[in-house]
């Protein structure tokens, strides 16, 4: 991670995001520590951890240690659990479990007594400064997790589509939840998630990349995701083999296969319309980002594909 972190800092990026999928990548918090140690101003985000593979006391200890190492430079991203969960035979956490976990983390990091699964505990560190507690962002692909995040977290990382109706949907969900939970919408952060892929042209890249993580459309509930009902079984068919680490992460032809499946199932045009399509030359990606900025999307969590 060191070369990536140093290059990111030289390029002037705000943050580097590090995945938490222990069967396919190096340990999350050790990687965060390396990146923080080797840089001076770069922020580091866990993108994203989960409430399943670490007890909240373990996660809080790691997070607090990193915050002491590099005050103000850690961001915590969390979700219900993707490859870290299903790769180890676990199901994603229920929304209520994720909510309770975030609450417990925040309590511990504020130096308070936390409650988790019927047990109470707290940090007993000498000299711990609760003001170092980092913001917590929740990655979400649907309205239930988004609503919960507005209640208990500091921001979201939505992957809910980029057609105009998708963007409007996310903004309205956030606005409604801020009213419901009496949050100041101007203090709630949105860091939009999308893939980006460099290539000779956007047209060329899109032959082998969908430009979107369509598997999350059918992870968990499909309610409120703006999916035409007739597409739900087709999307499940398209991603039937997706919970296999070799298939999902090691097959170099995976993107092209998904494009062909989408076309054969009659899903391609719909998926294309809702995709971020951040692909092609730097100029093409920059122009696309500029068009999103004009719609008020000015903070991103980007995953480089390919």
Task: Explain the meaning of each model-derived region.
Residues 1-7, 62, 140-148, 281-291:
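Short, acidic/polar
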Residues 1-46, 134:
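N-terminal beta1-alpha1-beta2 module of alpha/beta enzyme domains
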Residues 20-27, 51-57, 163-168, 197-198, ...:
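Acidic-and-aromatic substrate-binding clefts and catalytic sites of carbohydrate-active enzymes
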Residues 6-10, 32-43, 63-74, 150-151, ...:
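Acidic (Asp/Glu)-rich catalytic clusters
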């Amino acid at each position: 991670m060191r070369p990536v972190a140093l290059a990111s800092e030289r390029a002037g990026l705000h943050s580097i995001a590090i995945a938490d999928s222990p069967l396919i990548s190096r340990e999350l918090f050790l990687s965060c520590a390396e990146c923080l140690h080797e840089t001076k101003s770069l922020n580091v985000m866990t993108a994203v951890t989960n409430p399943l593979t670490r007890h909240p006391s373990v996660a809080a200890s790691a997070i607090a240690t990193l915050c002491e190492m590099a005050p103000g430079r850690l961001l915590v991203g969390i979700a219900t659990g993707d490859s870290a969960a299903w790769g180890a035979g676990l199901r994603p956490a229920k929304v209520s479990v994720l909510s309770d976990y975030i609450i417990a983390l925040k309590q511990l990091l504020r130096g308070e007594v936390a409650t988790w699964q019927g047990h109470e505990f707290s940090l007993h560190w000498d000299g711990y400064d609760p003001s170092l507690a980092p913001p917590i962002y929740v990655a979400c692909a649907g309205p239930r997790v988004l609503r919960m995040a507005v209640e208990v977290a500091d921001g979201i990382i939505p992957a809910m589509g980029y057609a105009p109706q998708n963007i409007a949907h996310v903004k309205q969900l956030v606005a409604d939840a801020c009213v419901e939970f009496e949050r100041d919408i101007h203090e709630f952060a949105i860091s939009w998630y999308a893939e980006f892929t460099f290539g000779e042209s956007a047209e060329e890249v899109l032959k082998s990349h969908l430009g979107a993580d369509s598997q999350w459309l059918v992870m968990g509930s499909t309610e409120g995701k703006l999916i035409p009902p007739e597409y739900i079984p087709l999307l499940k068919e398209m991603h039937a083999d997706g919970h296999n680490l070799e298939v999902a992460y090691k097959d170099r032809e995976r993107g092209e296969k998904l494009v062909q499946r989408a076309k054969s199932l009659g899903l391609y045009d719909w998926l294309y319309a809702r995709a971020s399509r951040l692909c092609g030359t730097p100029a093409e990606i920059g122009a696309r980002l500029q068009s999103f900025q004009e719609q008020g999307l000015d903070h991103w969590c980007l995953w480089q594909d390919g």
